[in-house]
């Protein structure tokens, strides 16, 4: 049995208070320490009601502190809020001492009464930039000034217009000194919490940001108890993300050392055995079958790289490995593909250079170890065909393919025959893979292909030939998976399943219901005893699981940060608000107006789906960076979802579709940088231009090289100082129309998008607008298509997406994809996905 006092630390202040509850009622817990894990689970299940009669929090204390791994408990909304109340320390939430506000103390001294001070504080935050910069400073990172979506000044003015200056100041009085982004997140969260829970909710919102360790402890507890799978628990989960990006807690020296030190590796990785190898074989057999996977002709593959190469970061190390010299400025992988003529894979000996960097995520900074582009090319060659053949029976390589609705359906489908949910949480999963295990995985995967011997040898050698370039020298990687490897998702997902198969044995694993994606695991097991056996066995074989983050029980399930219960599935509001405020910090490019609008629509919908107050769109429409110039009424319709940018989803039950059409001037002509390579473009044109594309080029005569090169070099673009002005797009409101026809969401989940007869000719999409209907009929005739089709563009390129009303709740991404799969005007969603 775990040490209850030590375990309590994982739950912050809530853990301390639960330990006190357990200590005060120790007579009720006599005998727990003499039972094995299964017996304790069974005893708690039977005693939960009796324990609750003694103290409402006692069953939670036993589950979280006295079990090897926590047991879910059915909690009413009132019981969940009782946990929230015990998670935070209200005594630390003190109103600012106005006399300490240097430069402004005399102003506050002249103001009468608390409400007057609140009004004046609200006035200053709305109108005094110097005051905001001093007492709500932006984080000291370039992206904080450029990339955040929501800034305090505009948000405060919108808040004051809706709720009044005094209400604004009454909240801000407890936030003085917070960074700008955290204050914004707190205000947005307080809006929802106050609407749901009254004035007490405002204190919880402030405490969620002021006390991040307590917020994280509460989140851990709610997940372990299963309260994350429904309201109100889901509203409080992952509140630690409200700290925003750039928390400066990452120790990169330690991160590098933990991958290169023999002692550190020995403590972290799961040793390879023949039994583990057999489990890897079983997973690969299940997902790939027995047929040999044909890899493409190497020359055909390499000369088509303009089509398949995906952008990613490119630095001096990657350039050096490819023989590219004297390049400066922002670099991307597609640029390198243009600059290299010969296929570098046959000459590759497996040597891989890794560049460490910091990824600024909401709530924490994370170390990224990016492998060089030569390694990317080599792994892409053999891994892409495997990914295309992958069945996804249990190991999911592309979770986004079926959408969150599809994910929830799979989980719910596994629950029809009874049983217990078991959600596992690997502790720092990348660090658990030994070099020998990864080499075995790649060798076994390659053995199912017709890969040449040199490639098999180089891939195997690459695992032991990986070096992190850090502080001017190369450090040999002795174990762990690099987070920026082309095979990161493949490796994690397969080994995720293989380790559990190894722990329980192949026969038992065959009988299990399980899903694996990255480091996420969902198991449906017959009994609590099976859960206990599985957890004990994973520990026995060396899997490091965080005991405070596992969850066992009947209440609900979680997979891919989606809480799933019998009535609906729900995402986590705090994480959505954090993303809404922070924006993306992957580059320092300012957001263009149309991108800003689309981002605001998607992120506001995510917040509303997860339970945000209905007044949120009004605040966002006035404060989201990049939306100036759009009419306020238009923005409110789009952000609330009652209208859409055509084509797209409309969130209404009225069967009326309201749409806006975007009118945007063409972008400035792209100028290829002087001396830029164009090998990928020229190789593709020479080797892969189809007869249909050649005919179309003859008809339309576009500047095809410039169009192709813009996709390779356009992301880097000119610097911010020289970037040409992009004219403001205009929104044109269309007449409302009645939505005709109905589709069910589950019917659309597995349905593909109908392609046109010219869809297999990718160059055409670069200049399709230059082709007249008569031009298209001539091209369609070349491939034997229907030249008399009423809509010749649909015949050529497939039916365009249409707008549909969403009768229910769906994430914007799922809803947009479903609009592409049906011509019906209404999509019925019987099981809501609130994410």
Swiss-Prot record:
Top-level taxonomic group = Viruses
EC main group? transferase
Family matches, as InterPro entries? DNA/RNA_pol_sf, RNA-dir_pol_luteovirus
The GO molecular function terms of this record are: hydrolase activity; nucleotide binding; RNA binding; RNA-directed RNA polymerase activity
Enzyme Commission numbers on file:
2.7.7.48
One GO BP annotation of this record: DNA-templated transcription
Q: Which SUPFAM superfamilies match?
A: DNA/RNA polymerases
Listed under catalytic activity are: RNA(n) + a ribonucleoside 5'-triphosphate = RNA(n+1) + diphosphate
Q: Which Pfam families match?
A: RdRP_4
Q: Which UniProt keywords apply?
A: Hydrolase, Nucleotide-binding, Nucleotidyltransferase, RNA-binding, RNA-directed RNA polymerase, Transferase, Viral RNA replication
Q: What does this protein do?
A: RNA-dependent RNA polymerase which replicates the viral genome. Catalyzes the transcription of fully conservative plus-strand genomic RNAs that are extruded from the virion into the cytoplasm where they function as mRNAs for translation of viral proteins and also as substrates for encapsidation to form new virions. Once encapsidated, the positive strand is converted to dsRNA by the RNA-directed RNA polymerase.
What does the miscellaneous comment read? Answer: RDRP is released as a separate protein consequent to an apparently coupled termination-reinitiation mechanism.
Record's family?
Answer: Belongs to the totiviridae RNA-directed RNA polymerase family.
Protein name, per record: Probable RNA-directed RNA polymerase
